[in-house]
A protein has these predicted regions:
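N-terminal beta1-alpha1-beta2 module of alpha/beta enzyme domains
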Residues: 1-57, 63, 158
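Residues in well-ordered alpha-helical elements
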Residues: 13-16, 68, 110-113
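Residue-level signal for the nucleotide or nucleotide-sugar donor/cofactor binding architecture
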Residues: 10, 64-68, 107
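Internal, glycine-rich beta/alpha segment that forms the wall or movable "lid"
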Residues: 71-176
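Acidic, glycine-rich active-site loops and adjacent beta-strand->loop/helix elements
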Residues: 36-37, 59-68, 91-95
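Generic domain-boundary/flexible-linker signal
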Residues: 14, 41, 66, 96-98, ...
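Generic recognition of short, well-ordered alpha-helical segments
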Residues: 17, 41, 68-72, 175
Length: 177
């Protein structure tokens, strides 16, 4: 059994010591959440202060960000952590998507499936040199020029988990995670 704990996010200057303490205490990982604070930046800081623990978003709100932007952030975190990053995503509810993030609402299961498929196509483009050609109903990624391709990191693909509430999202988790 793996045991993860929450990484305090309220003060980035405290993150190195907090992350090191989590690692020294024997935890298997540290998780950030998208509540009051952005979930990715503390993990970047923690990656520089740790060597062993898994670093994970638990969860980041997907639809508020482009899959291309999240793919890039996740790739950078995977590189900085030397393969210890896990991307946890969630769809959030309709009201938050529309009124808090000002993004259009659509059924979350097919949209999150495409979101993850699109990111994986982007990562394959970057890491394996595949032509980027992902076309779905919600997301289309067909342009990638050399100037925007990060250096290959030679690490395993970023693991993706999702917050699943309800039978349809649970089935999706079983298929894509």
């Amino acid at each position: 059994m793996r045991v993860l704990t929450v990484l305090p996010q309220h003060n980035l200057q405290d993150v190195p010591a907090e992350a090191a303490a989590i690692e020294a205490a024997g935890y298997d990982g540290a998780v950030t959440m998208e509540n009051k604070y952005e979930p990715f930046l503390p993990l970047a800081v923690a990656a520089t202060a740790t060597d062993r623990i898994e670093l994970s978003t638990g969860i980041a709100i997907a639809f508020a960000r482009s899959p291309m932007v999240v793919a890039e952030t996740a790739h950078d975190l995977q590189t900085a952590s030397k393969g210890r990053f896990t991307l946890g995503l969630g769809s959030q509810v309709k009201g938050h998507n529309e009124r808090r993030f000002s993004v259009p609402w659509s059924p979350p299961v097919p949209r999150l499936r495409e979101y993850i498929e699109g990111m994986r196509a982007i990562w394959r483009c970057w890491e394996k040199g595949e032509k980027l050609n992902y076309v779905g109903e919600h997301y289309q990624f067909t342009l990638m020029t050399p100037n925007f391709i990060p250096d290959r990191n030679g690490l395993p693909p970023v693991p993706v988990t999702i917050a699943a509430v309800g039978p349809a999202m649970l089935r999706l988790a079983g298929r894509v995670c």
